[in-house]
Amino acid sequence: GFDPEIVDYCLKKNIPVFPGCISPSEVAQAVKRGLKVVKFFPAEQAGGIAMIKAMAAPYQHLKFMPTGGINTGNLKDYLSCDKILCCGGSWMVKGDMIRNGEFDQIQVMVKEAKELADEIRFN
């Protein structure tokens, strides 16, 4: 979420900060502080790319990092939007895979995710 005290502290100490902004009010607070990138979570549950576009409309410079509910089925919707800096998601790597040491499979899945993102962004 957007905690003004944490954001202000980070800005004062020159620490990169990307607060979660789920409402137009939180986006306005971020912009007021000069931030250029915010996180949007939970993306799909909070309205997805349509909500991001609506909140970003008044702020040409603002970019979003959506996470939550993003997967191979909707990644293109996000990465095709110029308001999206990057996307995150646990769909690439499940916690059990890490705990079980399935690093070869993780490598394959991450490579596939990168290839999909590159295809969307650069084609």
Regions picked out by a protein language model, each given a short descriptive name:
Residues 10-16, 96-123:
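C-terminal helical cap(s) of enzyme catalytic domains, especially alpha/beta-barrels
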Residues 38, 78, 113:
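Conserved, mostly hydrophobic/aromatic
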